[in-house]
Regions:
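A short beta-strand-turn-helix
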Residues: 29-48
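Short, internal strand/loop/helix patches
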Residues: 83, 100-132
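Cleaved targeting-peptide boundary
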Residues: 20-26
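Positively charged n-region of N-terminal signal peptides that target proteins for export
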Residues: 1-4
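Hydrophobic h-region of N-terminal signal peptides that target proteins for export
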Residues: 9-18
Length: 169
């Protein structure tokens, strides 16, 4: 019994350590634009990208921080661009309604927003369960995940985000 328990604890420790390592080799993913046409992630491989992966049911989660990032231009620079991806698979709202609302907003602010109708991005990048989550990711042009926050962002995560993003702008 002790051997089984020890093996289980060792396995958990190994999984915890590997989860803490940055993900590398992330690939571009084909999603949909707001007109439901195929679209690849913009600037992938050309610039570092800041991805706001949002469940529309929780679009206000981290709203203040997202606005702060926009106002202080943290996602803008010679080497970095940001855009949004709507996690439509996990939303209870009709996809057409969400796209219409998003199109109207992007016409006003010029933002780029894509739609993930089948969790393609979450699965391809190993994000796990993103239902009811606001996921913020910084991906290098080489395909390495430099920063990720899921759910309500903490003050410590905000500080870490600014520390990391400053190096890549």
């Amino acid at each position: 019994m002790k051997k089984i328990l020890f093996t289980f604890v060792a396995l958990l420790a190994t999984l915890s350590l590997s989860a803490a390592e940055p993900k590398t080799g992330l690939q571009n993913v084909e999603l949909k634009n707001l007109k439901n046409e195929p679209a690849m992630l913009p600037w992938y491989g050309e610039k570092h990208i800041l991805v706001f992966y949002v469940d529309p049911d929780r679009h206000k989660q981290n709203e203040d921080f997202a606005r702060e990032i926009e106002e202080n231009h943290a996602a803008q620079g010679e080497n970095i661009e940001g855009f949004g991806v709507l996690n439509l698979k996990d939303s209870m709202l009709p996809n057409g309604l969400i796209r219409t609302i998003a199109r109207k907003r992007t016409e006003k602010n010029g933002a780029i927003v894509l739609a993930d109708t089948d969790r393609k991005l979450a699965e391809a990048w190993g994000l796990g369960d993103c239902n009811n989550q606001f996921v913020l990711m910084l991906i290098s042009r080489e395909g390495e995940m430099l920063f990720m926050s899921k759910g309500e962002i903490t003050e410590e995560q905000k500080a870490e985000f600014y520390r990391v993003v400053t190096k890549y702008r």
